[in-house]
């Protein structure tokens, strides 16, 4: 079984790299061991979120012996951290890899990469981030649902995100997103980092919903969109 896992993830890695290179992109980060693969890439395309604050398009992939996820990836140049847009329509989740012939599994990955490379995927993500940069957040109404999910990852994660958020002069949804993704950048555990980058992407895309409070404050209501379940 171990030999199969190594072969499958190696094939996926090579296919991913080929697809990215064919589109003038480059692989920026790779973690690969038998049965587990994390890889991120970027392309030359850029968008400006604020003055002198540019983001770069990309694709991120995670694969194990039983599943793979391929999503659009947005890399913020000024802080060198990225967000995984797991809720993008162009993203693909591929279950039951271990029941597919290698060629078929690799073909599905190639198709997923192609989907995530669509220019509309990056344009939509950049516009969502611009919108997030214009919306201040309420610590309790907006942030608490996300902080609860952060605490589920690790007891210290939520506290670290809050510290980073309040240390920066950006009290918007975009600022909150970047507090999460900057912590992801500095996290050594690959699974935790991926989940933080996914959560950062979700913060960017979640639309404010009216709170029933009398003062008319807005609250974000995140949906639980963790997708495929991976074993560590």
Cite the ranges covered by each PLM segment.
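A broad "ordered helical/assembly scaffold" signature
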Residues: 1-2, 35
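A short acidic/basic microdomain associated with nuclease active sites
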Residues: 21-45
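Residues at beta-strand starts and edge strands
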Residues: 11, 35-37, 55
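Intrinsically disordered, low-complexity regions enriched in serine/threonine
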Residues: 29, 45-232
């Amino acid at each position: 079984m171990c030999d199969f896992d190594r072969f499958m993830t190696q094939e996926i890695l090579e296919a991913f790299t080929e697809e990215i290179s064919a589109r003038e992109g480059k692989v920026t980060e790779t973690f690969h061991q038998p049965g587990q693969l994390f890889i991120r890439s970027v392309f030359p395309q850029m968008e400006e979120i604020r003055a002198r604050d540019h983001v770069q398009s990309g694709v991120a992939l995670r694969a194990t012996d039983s599943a793979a996820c391929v999503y659009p990836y947005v890399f913020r140049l000024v802080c060198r951290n990225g967000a995984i847009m797991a809720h993008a329509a162009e993203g693909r989740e591929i279950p039951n890899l271990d029941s597919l012939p290698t060629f078929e599994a690799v073909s599905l990955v190639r198709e997923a990469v192609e989907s995530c490379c669509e220019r509309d995927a990056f344009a939509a993500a950049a516009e969502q981030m611009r919108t997030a940069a214009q919306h201040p957040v309420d610590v309790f109404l907006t942030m608490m649902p996300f902080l609860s999910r952060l605490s589920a990852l690790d007891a210290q994660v939520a506290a670290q995100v809050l510290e980073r958020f309040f240390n920066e002069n950006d009290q918007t949804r975009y600022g909150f997103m970047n507090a999460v993704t900057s912590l992801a950048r500095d996290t050594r555990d690959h699974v935790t980092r991926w989940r933080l980058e996914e959560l950062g992407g979700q913060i960017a895309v979640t639309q404010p919903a009216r709170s029933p409070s009398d003062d008319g404050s807005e609250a974000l209501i995140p949906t639980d969109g963790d997708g495929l379940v991976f074993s560590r």
